[in-house]
Amino acid sequence: MAAAKPKVSKAKVTVKVLTKNQAALLKAKKLSVQVRSTGKTKVKVSAAKGGNAKLFKAKTIKFKRKGKRTVGLALTSSGRSLLGKCGAQSVKVTAKYKRGKKNATAKKGKTLARDAKLCGPDEPPVEKPNPATTPNCDPIDPVACMLPFPNDYFTKPDSSTDTGLRLDFKAENMPTNAEGKSIYNGAYNRNDGFSPNNVIVTKVPGMDTPETFRENGFVSQMNIGAYDDPAQRVVLIDTTNNQRVPIWAELDMIPGTPNPHGGGLVDGTAQDRTMLIHPAQSLEYGRRYVVALRDLTVGGSPVAVNEVFKYLRDGVETANQQVEERRAQMSDVFSATDAAGIPRGSLNVAWEFTVASEKNLTERVMSMREDAFDQLGDTNLADGVIQGDAPNITIDSTFDYGTCPNSTTACGGGQSRYAFKRIRGTIEVPCYMNAPGTEYTKDPAGATTPCASGSRLNYAPGSDLPTQKMDGATPVTWDAPFTCIIPRTGENVNAMATSGLKAIIFGHGLMQSNATTEQLGYYPAALEGVACGTDWIGLSNQDLGQHLLKMIDVFSSTSDLSIFEALPDRTQQGYINTLYLARALAHEDGFASFPAFRSGGVPVFDVDQNDTGKDLGYYGVSLGGINGGATTALAPDWERATLAVPGMGFSTMLTRSTQFNQFLPTVYAAYTNPVDRAIGISMLQVLWDRGEPSAYSKSILNGGLGTPEHEVLIQESFGDHQVANIQTQTLARSIGATAKGPILADGRITDLGVLANGGDYLFTKMDQVDPYWNIPVAQSSQFNQAGGLPGENAVMMTTDTGPVVHGVDGNPVLGTKANPDWNIAPVSGNATVDNEGYDPHQPGATSPAIQQMLMPFLLGDGFHDACGDGAPDIYGQPPFPVPLSSPNPVPCPAPPIDYIRNGH
């Protein structure tokens, strides 16, 4: 019989200052503190004045059981000097300890009455400054109420969460639209911290041009390695280890810049530009981070420090209660900057924020997944073994494609060169969403239907976990649509493949649908198995027609932004829909049992019931690549995922993407205050995390969320106009991907176009450029092998359409410039800013040459360099190599350019 595990003590500690006054402190040369504990624990006791923790020597004491102890915290020489001056002295005691497995802190402050003997008889009392502040707004950055952001000032203690905190947003303090409607949403306050990929926002007085930015030598997206330069003026500190964290910074260039999306100037001027600071890889769950800006200058002159921050930094007491309450919170901030070796007097501003816990970020969709698969009878999702039943499947239609009459031209309607059959139907999926109501959708019929467009997660009363039961009683389901296609036995051969095929889950792009799965039948080497896809609800075409049009109305100031919650909520339901589709493909009683998927009485595809991952893979493009990263972290039935043109951190991708150009003018018109707009976009990430990889990136490869381990191939299109390269690289860093090298041909990273600043990037000098910092590179020869990746679980390959090629009308037909290093999307030739070339987003994922690298990996044959020459993958001009299945690859003609441009 196994020995019982010892109970973990959950002792609670309190502290009390016993020293009566200043005279007693100076006489004893120590601060007397009483420490009480309700059980066994170890306590580190320290004291500070005005956030200065170097005035007293800390002590650590141990409790073996419940009791109280008195400790003396000796004054240091600087403490005797500072606290020996005339005047009452306010001190704060902090006790740090373990409560169970969680870190806990007890704090207590006291003002020690002054020693009159230290004050001259005629010395007038010192009048304390009393700066003006706004209730519930952080006084250290008064430009806007919720600056700086993210910020633990906007949290409250909550012992029920893993971080010990809960967000405490208030409607009256949050950004508002043109009609004065707050973007407040109660969903924010379900979080126990901020996003691992939050855009960090603050305002630096006078810093509003690229010249003033470069004057300070800030780390930027093109030279991330500068984050740990000894003199770096913007730093992010992980307080767990006092180490700097990789970041990059920029100015919000939207205010005062000609609007590339139409409509002239965006509201605001250069003076409204905030500083935006971005993590270069996902931050760690549940950790506390300190942001610090120091030694800032504009035009060679020091930037003025906000008076409240200066009072806190320099230990100057005020008569303002809100400032003094903030002082207690700032003590840990200054302790972190002290430990990081940053002189306190150099600070322009500093603050702290806590990242949400893994449990908080993942438990909603995890509870949905566990419940959904429990209903099928599979209670162990980590073993790759099928247990229980297949989902309920309905086949609605089948269609046999015609062959193409000419192999060198595009197919006509109802024809496909590579696909033989299309099958459409639905899968019954547990629905964990409510009925949207008319305020969330333009579809009257869908307003009363759970899981319809505009619906949000359905929470049981008093619970933070979604439930399938409407009104607490009736479980509801959703018929998730799917499209599957089965390949031919060869190009234009009028016969269906008969047996032994692999299975592929396909993830479509933004505002598309399950029908996009058919496109796999258009490209050479793309359809190498039975492929099935469902809708990425939340950002599918059904949402565009209903919920997203309603969202546009909201942005147009008819309501507040609480409707946004539906987008990431619906995406999480979409993960469950996709996992059920995968189980329908993997299970022998699923699709394989239907005649439409059989030939001669035998299924045309074969998935091992004891190791599903070797026969089933995931392939997603664009939104499918983004959502595919998150779903792979949750996926029990596939091992390998190919993520084409993916990224993470939607709040950073948003304004950089041409896909959102149709929405942004409406956003700009509804939210006219540039600073509030920047804060609002950053806030969205707190909700959006669960609807993209930010919440799940730490577990994509390692099976940390109760799945088998996974392998991932990331495909980046250099200069992508829809998914900025910087966010694809952020995903690669976050999961530890190795890049296939050489990454780019010489000169490509310097091909900047009209946004070049005297030959440099806007925020970075060309001789400092290193965009792929901290992504290991392995040369091509290390990859050409079967059986998996070369010692890695993740690889990133960068493909390039090459320099811009212009057509007879002068418009670009192929090739692109590098991404500009600002937060505005590349634009087309008829916009107010000259074009940046032809968007490589679609060709980058669908070129025959690229398919030759994506598909063999997906099917378990490892990662291969289809170009075969060890050179960077510039594939813009023909000839393209033929698929690897050919014993002697030879060049083949490219599809007609209009074929790709029209999205076929």
Model segments located where?
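Cap/lid segment of the alpha/beta-hydrolase catalytic domain
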Residues: 437-438, 442-479, 495-600
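Domain-level recognition of soluble alpha/beta enzyme cores
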Residues: 386-496, 503
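A conserved hydrophobic secondary-structure block that centers on an alpha-helix together
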Residues: 269-294, 298-299, 470, 475-521
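Short proline/glycine- and polar residue-rich coil/turn motifs
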Residues: 60-69, 265-270, 472-476
